[in-house]
């Protein structure tokens, strides 16, 4: 069929020959009439990939001789597996969909949350959210959409609310958007969609983080749309978090965005310097550490005001103080430097940073750092840029938003770039495999990430 073949040739230019051969040319053409094309996929996973990556292109790019759109229908006939393998898969499915409801940090409570002018509103709204209709006067915003940069306290507030709701016996589901997508793909592949829907819809409240990850995932958005509608129509509570306001979400359907705005969308801002110091002083008191304020200021500066990093460092400090029997001693800056020497070294000049990753990738490909960070779409620069983004995600565990800030790109571009590299790795692309291996070896030998703190077992 000529229209389909022309469409495939166009896709080869956009996403590469290997990808087209693996995912599209392997689709079997079953039947074609003037306005309908029927394809057979090798399995359900191939259908999911088609829906996520190609469906939107087909709608605008596949037309017949009369320039009318061709509707594409994709079905699959999965091959039967041997009995023992089928039984093993059945066990895996059972274990997978007897899913846990998401654990929370017991330290993340409303009482441990530092309320400041920057976060007073979301704090009060989430607290009201956990009360019964009798307690809050029957007024409940649903959904609640929290948005703000990494480290602003979204996770703390969500987990605080979850703990309160679970204490009252509620069935509260807490997932990331990545996990929702993984569950969906697994359900499609294993033919367990009914179990998936039952799990996600028979709950009292849904808390889902990082909704921007749904960007460009049409099949995932479709399923979440119906999940949202089902929960909302039954009066079940929904809390969504993101780094972006609803109107700023990229490649997310308008109907989903409108639903996020049905309740209340609340910005939450990171702590300013004074607020951060106050928050950490409370943690110091909780951990029974006696530390001079200037020593704490030094730690804040040395660890770049990163809240998660600072909390981890304080927990290590408390354990080391206890081990060395220094609980009653006031800690000065020199004491902190001694007790957290390894942590501070990891955060110092030897720690891995996005800039060092970019420098190493640039050296490997023989291009300049400026070209990787620039706007050129030449393949000579695009591939190194994508590889650098991939390493920022893999080595530093940076969020898509943070990587976007580094490379001056929106998060959807970052997500698609990283996925492209992951896909090439899965396809065993020789060039990519060698590049990832060599660059990774170089990064591992030269640096260690700020995230890789000494484990508690190593402190003595």
Curated annotation (Swiss-Prot):
Gene3D superfamilies given in the database record: 1.10.1750.10, 3.30.300.180, P-loop containing nucleotide triphosphate hydrolases
Location, primary (coarse class): cytoplasm
Single GO MF annotation: lipid binding
Any one GO CC term of the record: plasma membrane
Keyword ATP-binding: yes
Domain III, AAA+ region, as annotated region: 103-321
GO biological process terms, semicolon-separated: DNA replication initiation; regulation of DNA replication
Location in or out of the cell: Cytoplasm
Region listing for Domain I, interacts with DnaA modulators, in residue ranges: 1-68
PROSITE patterns reported in the protein's UniProt record: DNAA
Domain of life from the UniProt record: Bacteria
Pfam families with a match to the protein in the record: Bac_DnaA, Bac_DnaA_C
SMART domains: AAA (SM00382), Bac_DnaA_C (SM00760)
Binding residues annotated for ATP, in chain numbering: 151, 153-155
Family the entry assigns: Belongs to the DnaA family.
Described purpose of this protein according to its UniProt entry: Plays an essential role in the initiation and regulation of chromosomal replication. ATP-DnaA binds to the origin of replication (oriC) to initiate formation of the DNA replication initiation complex once per cell cycle. Binds the DnaA box (a 9 base pair repeat at the origin) and separates the double-stranded (ds)DNA. Forms a right-handed helical filament on oriC DNA; dsDNA binds to the exterior of the filament while single-stranded (ss)DNA is stabiized in the filament's interior.
The protein's name in its UniProt record: Chromosomal replication initiator protein DnaA 1
Organism: Chlamydia pneumoniae (Chlamydophila pneumoniae)
Taxonomic lineage of the native organism: Bacteria, Pseudomonadati, Chlamydiota, Chlamydiia, Chlamydiales
């Amino acid at each position: 069929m000529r229209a389909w073949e022309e469409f495939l040739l166009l896709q080869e230019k956009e996403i590469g020959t290997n990808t087209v051969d693996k995912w599209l040319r392997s689709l079997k053409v079953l039947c074609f009439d003037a306005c309908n094309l029927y394809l057979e996929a090798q399995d359900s996973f191939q259908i999911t990939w088609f829906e996520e990556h190609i469906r939107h292109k087909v709608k605008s790019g596949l037309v017949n001789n009369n320039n009318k759109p061709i509707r594409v229908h994709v079905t699959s006939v999965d091959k039967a597996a041997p009995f023992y393998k089928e039984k093993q898969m059945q066990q895996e499915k059972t274990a997978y969909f007897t899913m846990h409801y998401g654990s929370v940090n017991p330290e993340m409570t409303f009482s441990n949350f530092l309320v400041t002018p920057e976060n007073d509103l979301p704090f009060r709204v989430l607290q009201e959210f956990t009360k019964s209709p009798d307690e809050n006067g029957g007024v409940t915003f649903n959904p609640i959409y929290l948005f703000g940069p990494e480290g602003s306290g979204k996770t703390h507030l969500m987990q605080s609310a979850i703990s309160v709701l679970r204490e009252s016996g509620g069935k509260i589901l807490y997932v990331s958007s990545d996990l929702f997508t993984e569950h969906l793909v697994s359900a499609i592949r294993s033919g367990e969609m009914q179990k998936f829907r039952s799990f996600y819809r028979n709950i009292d409240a849904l808390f889902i983080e990082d909704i921007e990850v749904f960007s460009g995932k049409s099949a995932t958005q479709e399923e979440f749309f119906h999940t949202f509608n089902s929960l909302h129509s039954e009066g079940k509570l929904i809390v969504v978090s993101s780094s972006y306001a609803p109107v700023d979400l990229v490649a997310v359907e308008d109907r989903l965005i409108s639903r996020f705005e049905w309740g209340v969308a609340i910005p939450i801002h990171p702590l300013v310097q004074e607020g951060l110091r106050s928050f950490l002083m409370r943690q110091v008191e909780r951990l029974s550490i006696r530390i001079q304020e200037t020593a704490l200021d030094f730690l804040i500066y040395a660890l770049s005001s990163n809240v998660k990093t600072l909390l981890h460092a304080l927990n290590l400090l408390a354990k080391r103080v206890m081990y060395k029997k220094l609980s009653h001693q006031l800690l000065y800056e020199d004491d902190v430097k001694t007790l957290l020497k390894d942590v501070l070294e990891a955060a110092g000049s030897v720690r891995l940073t996005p800039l060092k990753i970019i420098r190493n990738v640039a050296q490997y490909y023989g291009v300049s750092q400026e070209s990787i960070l620039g706007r050129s779409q030449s393949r000579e620069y695009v591939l190194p840029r994508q590889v650098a983004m991939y390493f920022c995600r893999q080595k530093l565990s940076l969020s898509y938003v943070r990587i976007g800030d580094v490379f001056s790109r929106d998060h959807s571009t970052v997500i698609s770039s990283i996925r492209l590299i992951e896909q090439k790795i899965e396809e065993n692309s020789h060039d990519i495999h060698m590049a990832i291996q060599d660059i990774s070896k170089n990064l591992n030998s030269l640096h260690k990430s700020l995230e890789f703190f000494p484990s508690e077992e190593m402190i003595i």
